[in-house]
A protein has these predicted regions:
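N-terminal membrane-targeting/anchoring modules of bacterial envelope and secretion proteins
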Residues: 2-3, 13-542, 547-548, 555-581, ...
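Ala/Thr-enriched low-complexity intrinsically disordered regions
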Residues: 8-9
């Protein structure tokens, strides 16, 4: 018997090694699979979910939640066994603070659970059938509220999860999500609900009868028309920008669009008349600061002068002069600095988000009305939050929670057509009241109840633009000799630079450039003409200076001449002269010389305020009349002496004759 060439112990060790190698290979395959799969599942939004229906039908134990929409494979991987399952979080939301926490929570948080009862899920495609990238499918899932565990009165977050595999295995992952809010039950009390409709638009006013563009022609038939009609409803208050009213009134009377140099007739006259008729039916309103400027930026920079200009401009719109003033920061925040700044305007109402929701509070700047600026915000995501369904769901949730906490009340700000449409939705738990009937908080406003500080949307660098614009207007009014006109121009245009309605700061800068174009002053605007060499031939010598006004408005200037030797020759400045647009005027000036000789001179133009305009002109004055005057004196003296001598001779010659005759 031949001996075994490989001992049994060694064979045993070899078998162990083979087993270990096989196990290691299996583990390696598993690791590779795990390494590959997460990359395909890494993006939970590989499948886009859009909810189109979210409603509860029925009551009590038979109430059913209906969710419907579409799912789209937006990834690059083919998916298998795609399913849409109902998801919900059974935590009842009963306050706005809890709602804010729910909105801030990650959509991938491990809260809530899926429901797999019949009807609560839908299979989009079975295992053998692939769901290719770009494919879209509809879905509808229904569940009883009792099965979902949504029974207590409150607001709940519900939605769907999309589950799928990247192969034909049973390894499923969540590849898409959508969430929204639903209300369950009915609050035991009604919420005092107020709405403030904001009537404002981007500035376009360039002066009497002229707008920079015709965007209002469309808005008066769309957004602004919807808003003014919304303001007629019970418990709704309006606040209008006097600049908007001025522009619409001007449109109704006939207007042009463009610039002072090039313009065409506007197209919104009929729409303006209709809108003004609608506005005339409103009552119980407020006015906004002229031009809807960013009050938070003014407060931060201490710009009290522009605040004053808003008051001056509003006074020019006499139809609205009796309306009380309503103010707010762009983010509806407030703080001590903001209130101190706007107190200068003496507002009746300050809209602000506070911890005393829906109530009014006394303050040094007027009554602070606490608002809910998020009333028309969107859904929780990760799906599209800016859809009609999500806006309605959020609107109902905010309103429902206000009713569950009736001491808070509910004040909403309406500024768009969609806001107006949502605000018109009837909610049984709301009691409509004007803001004047809101509950007064037990304590006055303080920093402790502020939700956040006031912040602006305009950049503070625009303050420099306003300063430069103001300087330009000063130059213009100095040249035109009309300080009152300067006050009007400043108030009409400067506050609008900080309007919160601009899409960008660059748009604000461009507007002011266009608005102030007619009031420009440059070196060539007023021209001087004088002879290069002027000779004084007598004490009463005058010489002309011609002044030409190339501007399209009258100017008032003085002619001023400086010389290289004021002691030898000086020229008094002229009286103030008015030169009409495009006209020329000759001004005669009278130099005063005390000695002969040539003197270098420069002629200037100055305004009544002493500001220099035009381009100075150099010339020479040659004074020769002083020598001639001396010779005239000598000759005259000689003539007088000769005359006296002749007279004396005659007197002497006659004297003897008189004696003889005696």
């Amino acid at each position: 018997m031949r001996p075994d060439p490989v001992p049994a112990a060694r064979r045993q060790r070899a078998r162990i090694v083979v087993v270990l190698l096989r196990v290691s290979l299996g583990l390696l395959v598993m690791v590779m699979a795990l390494a590959i799969h997460p990359s395909a599942y890494a993006a939970d939004t590989a499948v886009d979910v859009k909810l189109t229906t979210s409603e509860i039908t029925g009551t009590g134990a038979n109430a059913v939640l209906h969710l419907a929409g579409t799912v789209t494979n937006t990834g690059t991987a083919t998916l298998y066994t795609v399913q849409v399952l109902t998801w919900r979080d059974t935590t009842s939301i009963t306050s706005r603070a809890q709602l804010a926490s729910a909105l801030a929570a990650s959509p991938t948080a491990t809260t809530g659970a899926r429901l797999t009862t019949p009807g609560a899920f839908q299979v989009i495609t079975g295992s053998p059938k692939p769901w290719e990238p770009g494919a879209t499918s509809p879905f509808t899932v229904t569940s009883k509220l009792s099965d979902l565990g949504l029974t207590a009165t409150g607001v709940y977050m519900v939605g769907v999860h999309v589950r799928a595999a990247i192969d034909m295995s049973a390894s499923y992952n969540t590849v898409g999500r959508a969430r929204t809010f639903v209300t369950v039950g009915t609050p035991s009390a009604q919420a005092a609900t107020s709405t403030v409709v904001m009537l404002s638009s981007t500035p376009s006013y360039l002066g009497s009868g002229l707008l920079s563009d015709d965007h209002l022609a469309g808005e008066l038939q769309g957004r602004l028309l919807a808003l003014v009609r919304s303001a007629r409803r019970l418990g709704v208050t309006y606040a209008i920008d006097p600049l908007l009213y001025r522009e619409v009134s001007m449109m109704a009377a006939g207007y042009d669009v463009g610039t002072t140099a090039a313009h065409t007739p506007g197209t919104g006259g009929a729409a303006a008349i209709e809108w003004l008729n609608e506005f005339a039916n409103l009552s119980g309103g407020y006015r906004l600061p002229y031009g809807s400027p960013d009050l938070a930026v003014m407060a931060a920079t201490g710009d009290s002068s522009t605040l004053d200009l808003t008051t001056q401009a509003a006074a020019q719109v006499t139809d609205l002069a009796d309306l009380p003033l309503l103010v707010a920061a762009p983010n509806y925040g407030t703080d001590d600095r903001f209130l101190a700044a706007v107190a200068q305007l003496k507002p009746a109402v300050v809209l602000a988000e506070t911890k005393a929701s829906g109530q009014s509070l006394t303050s040094s700047a007027g009554t602070v009305v606490s608002v809910d600026p998020a009333a028309f915000a969107g859904g929780p995501g990760p799906d599209d939050t800016d859809t009609p369904l999500q806006h309605l769901a959020r609107f109902r949730a905010e309103s429902f929670l206000a009713a569950m906490n009736p001491a808070e009340g509910n004040v909403r700000i309406v500024a768009t057509e969609s806001d107006a449409a949502l605000d018109a939705t009837a909610n049984l738990w709301e009691a409509r009241v004007p803001i004047s009937q809101l509950r007064v908080a037990a304590s006055p406003w303080s920093a402790a109840v502020a939700a956040h500080a006031a912040t602006g949307v305009r950049d503070s660098s625009l303050e420099r633009v306003i300063t430069e614009g103001a300087a330009r207007i000063v130059d213009f009014t100095s040249l035109a000799g009309d300080s009152a006109a300067g006050d009007v121009i400043r108030s009409e245009f400067l506050p609008s630079v900080l309007s919160t309605t601009w899409r960008s700061d660059d748009d604000a800068r461009a507007y002011l450039t266009t608005a102030l174009a007619p009031y420009g002053v440059n070196a060539a605007a007023v021209q001087l003409s004088v002879a290069e060499h002027v000779v004084m031939t007598s004490r009463n010598t005058q010489f002309p200076v011609t002044v030409k006004n190339t501007l399209d408005y009258p100017v008032k200037v003085k002619v001023m001449i400086t010389t290289s030797n004021e002691n030898r020759l000086s020229v008094p400045e002229s009286d103030l002269v008015t030169i009409d647009a495009g006209e020329s005027v000759t001004v005669n000036v009278s130099p005063r010389a005390t000695a002969n000789g040539s003197v270098d001179a420069v002629v200037h133009l100055v305004t009544q305020a002493g500001n220099e305009v035009g381009t100075p002109q150099a010339f020479v004055i040659d004074a020769t009349e002083t020598g001639k005057v001396a010779w005239v004196i000598v000759i005259a003296s000689g003539v007088v002496l000769a005359a006296m001598t002749v007279l004396r001779i005659r007197q002497v010659a006659r004297a003897p004759r008189r004696k003889e005759g005696a």
